[in-house]
């Protein structure tokens, strides 16, 4: 049994596009080859969730609540580099964990800051052309798409310190 869904080798772009990374005609691939996951350039906004809670109703039946989800696109630092995911930057999404997640069952997380609430994700919305790959400066200098400290709620910053992007890449003028 796998510990996480990331324990199995991922499907790669090269599984179908054999010469994608070796093609010297794609300058962005040559420049960013081992620094960015493919999704950083080829994914769109996707679903994020927050504040999942469990509990028991007046009859003692378990229930779950969740704040409304939202669409967002964020690039974060990769805190869990592996041979299959060696990239410095990956697409991240907010997951609905919090200290009170299982409070209704009498379980309190002893250290909610031990695990980030912004996690690496592999969205299923890959496209060749996306807003962030329209030009170099559609990404470089665009703080809106990076998981900066301002994009993280103050009470989640400690847990996400290894995912938060300290400095947005500077504009290139291209």
What are these language model-derived features?
Residues 1-174:
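C-type cytochrome heme-c attachment and multiheme electron-transfer modules
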